[in-house]
Amino acid sequence: MSLDGGVEILKLARLLGAEPEDLGYLQYVAPQDIRDVREQVTAAIFDADRQMLQRVAAATKVIPSKLAAAVAQQALGALLCARVTSLLEPARAVDIARRLPTDFLADLAVELDPRRASRVIAEIPARQIGQITAELVEREEYIAMGGFVGHLPEASLRAATEAVDDEALLLTASVIEAKGNLGALVGLLDEERLESIIRTAHEADLWPEALDVLGHVSERQRGQLGDLAAAQEDAVLDGMVRAAQSERLWADVLPVTRAMSPDSRARFAKLKSVQTRPVLASIVDAASQQHLWPELLVLLPLLPAAARRRVAALGTGFGRSIFEQIVRAADEHDLWDALELFASELEPGSQQQIEELYKAVGRA
């Protein structure tokens, strides 16, 4: 089961009040299909009894905020309050929220659909967001936290990141609702914090979660994180290689190696853990399936001769269509030297195919 599939099952189980194991049969369903079901269930839950909820929301307008907070906590409870929140004017909701204790607001956050209350969330003071986040971390409510990331302004997001430790941040990032927001999250962290997170990924066995983040940030951030990882000791990088191999995450790792500085890329290529035949086979397979030939060609000249021969041995079985993709990648990215090095290690029949393709693009 993919990481995304596991995350979607966790989220659906949470919404239904079930154990993830009870939904194990969904491991064979596409993650997006599980997400679609979850969104339909969410809509059904939050749209049920809408008229009654609107009457509750209207009632809060005619009583003082202090009394509304007391009613919310003592009579309505977190679940009902979560469903009413999106029906309140943001300023009114924030005024009530500032009178509620942090533990109750954390209860409410767990039940809330942030997409329906985005305007309210955006206006809650950053200090209060930090307090709620700390409470959610204490409860290990990573799924709830992940849902809020795309709805927090920068000051609030910064307060939230300061309230969590590295392990909690990685676990939250892996279940974030909108992965496109990961770049903004990473952008708030200085190099010291990023280095600490990389070490934590190794020490806490959270490389799969960390590599998932790398697949959703900008090219510049990918290179920065790759360079920071390459500066760590071999044990840290070997842990990343093992995770990429066991979880089949080379499609996430290869773009990182291309975005690295030349020195960092060379350091990665010199790792003995990268040079084994099973790992090289997985790298070549990822390049083939995800059209990552430029990433592989950039890495290839940096591998020791024995490792390059292993890659060439794997390439001997390629059909003409694969060789066409490789030559096209070399042509588009000016990686001819790397391709020629690769071709020099191939058996004569494959070399002949490469030579014919050279002529087709005017390189003869």
Where are these regions (language model features)?
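Hydrophobic packing positions in regular secondary-structure scaffolds
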Residues: 1-364
